[in-house]
Amino acid sequence: MIVDNSKDFDLKSFLANLTTHSGVYRMLDKHGEIIYVGKAKNLKNRINSYFSKGAKDSKTLMMVEQIARIEITITPSDYEAYLLENNLIKQHRPKYNILFKDDKSYPYLVISRDKFPRVSFYRGKSAYKKGQCFGPYVSISSVKNTLNTIQKIFPIRQCENSYYKSRVRPCLQYQIKRCLAPCVGLVSQQQYDEQLAILKKFLAGKFSSVLEEISANMYQASEDMEYEKAQVYRDQLVVLRKLQQQQIVDIQEDKTFDVIGIYMQDSYASIALLQIQNGDVVADRHWSIDAKGQDKTSIMHAFLSHFYLGDEIRNIWPKNIILSKVEFADITDLMNSISQKIGQAINWIIAPAADNLKWLKLAEVNARQKLNIYTSSKSQYQKRLESLKEFLESEKDIKRIECFDISHFQGEATIASCVVYTDDGEDRKSHRRYNIKDIKSGDDYAAIHQAVSRRVSSGLEADNLPDVMIIDGGKGQIHQAEAVFREYGIQDKVQLVSLGKGVERISGKEKIYKGFDDTEYTLDEHNPGFLLLRQVRDSAHDHAIKGQRKKVSANRQSSIIEEIEGVGPKRRKALMMYFGGWQELSRASVDEIAKVKGISKKLAQEIWECFH
């Protein structure tokens, strides 16, 4: 249950009446924004400790000063408290929690849920929605190499469903024995499923088991005088044996573990995770964080909760987890919760012996190296922010920058892009695009006015206006933004600046205008603040171009269909609902198109001819 939903929050009364149950608490500021999420075995003791006279670090003191309200959720156990805490942190990303930012979106191999499944790869954790996932892999090249290896050993289809459904005869992959051609019924469901089951074992790292099973199948097929089938198994074994010889270490299936190394320097920390399977490093991942006021134990505690109690996709959970030295007593409850979530006991190794110590040292070296890179990059970016602040004569630190750019194709398909940079760097998840409507063809000024107006309107409502707004363009563009600022009365809330190439249009010689100031400024091309302006502007330009190209492509495909007599809005919608997009429709056969509700065979033929 949620306690305290009142608008008038009485802190003294709240603290006096707190429960001693376990649960999760949320600290909110005066704007109603969650600034910290925590969990506790005893909510009363934990929350009261923030307001006691005991020693506290500067970060905690700063947070306490901003608390305007506290909410709690009572949970039936510590396990549920850990899960809820983790989910709330991911959902709200409170500024006083330790936030882990994975270095990249990792690719996964996915076996689809089709009757005859395909194997493919997807980036990011949304991959699990596509089917059974294996991974993550450390890079696109590694996952593509694995796909290539799979195709040589296991004749499982890799084609898109639209291509698969349109086949009337086997493709080249069947001819070179890299697919069983389920598209035209050349393999039974049982035979296909047998190959699929072995593939899943292979992807799960059960190499020895795969070799044994294929070998047994080969001998059985030979005894049954199914010599062609036996030859297929033999060919699989040949490729697998070659693959086995390429491995650096012997296969040791009992050696499946994660190694977590941590390194701290000043107010920053880095975590390196090595995933070991069969005695070999199969993946390494890194997280770098701002860790002011935190120690190794609190960071490790937060990371274990973030990684193992989150939505991480793992097919093989480690039997052992090796950690950098931390205070074991402080994380025992969390360890039990992790074991409960993944459904198996874990051997936690805090002080590894010689055999495993080398892995921990390797993880810690990786963490240190990554932190050196992170702090160097962070330092350079902070210098650019400070230089821009100085140029703009700003009294407050720059926490959020937004930049607008306009793109169109011959005056049509106009898109406004808005990219976001924070004091941590580019925030890709916050980028967005605006479809510009009801303006004259090619009118960039009206497009800027509309996009900025929509952003300012929503920003005032959500109380998330940027500190600096950059407009890609010259005097004309910035004057349009100024008009919007006057309309909403935010001249003193957001600093406005534009960056244009001027008459010469030479990169590095851009003209700069500050909001409500007609003075033309120039900065040295190596000035850190100028480099930041160009960096953000170029990012906005790229984002706009990509969006505009997508819109042009969609408009062209849509206009092609609109020219066909008998295909109105309802049928266009039905086609999109069935195929999911114009690209998939363009690949479909006449018979496949005719399956769409309301589309006759004759009309399907006309639609097909539009794309061919």
From Swiss-Prot:
One of its GO terms (cellular component) is cytoplasm. Keywords: Cytoplasm, DNA damage, DNA excision, DNA repair, Excision nuclease, SOS response. Its main location: cytoplasm. Interacts with UvrB in an incision complex. Residues 208-243 form the UVR domain. Gene3D superfamilies: 5' to 3' exonuclease, C-terminal subdomain, GIY-YIG endonuclease, UVR domain, UvrC, RNAse H endonuclease domain. It comes from the Bacteria. This is UvrABC system protein C. The lineage of its organism: Bacteria, Pseudomonadati, Pseudomonadota, Gammaproteobacteria, Thiotrichales. GO terms for biological process: nucleotide-excision repair; SOS response. The UvrABC repair system catalyzes the recognition and processing of DNA lesions. UvrC both incises the 5' and 3' sides of the lesion. The N-terminal half is responsible for the 3' incision and the C-terminal half is responsible for the 5' incision. SUPFAM superfamilies: C-terminal UvrC-binding domain of UvrB, GIY-YIG endonuclease, RuvA domain 2-like. Residues 20-98 form the GIY-YIG domain. It is found in: Cytoplasm. It comes from Francisella tularensis subsp. holarctica (strain LVS). PROSITE patterns: GIY_YIG (PS50164), UVR (PS50151), UVRC (PS50165). Belongs to the UvrC family. Transmembrane segments: none annotated. The keyword Iron does not apply. The gene is uvrC. The keyword Cytoplasm applies. Pfam families: GIY-YIG (PF01541), HHH_5 (PF14520), UVR (PF02151), UvrC_RNaseH (PF22920), UvrC_RNaseH_dom (PF08459). GO terms for molecular function: DNA binding; excinuclease ABC activity. InterPro entries: GIY-YIG_endonuc (IPR000305), GIY-YIG_endonuc_sf (IPR035901), GIY-YIG_UvrC_Cho (IPR047296), RuvA_2-like (IPR010994), UVR_dom (IPR001943), UVR_dom_sf (IPR036876), UvrABC_protein_C (IPR050066), UvrC (IPR004791).
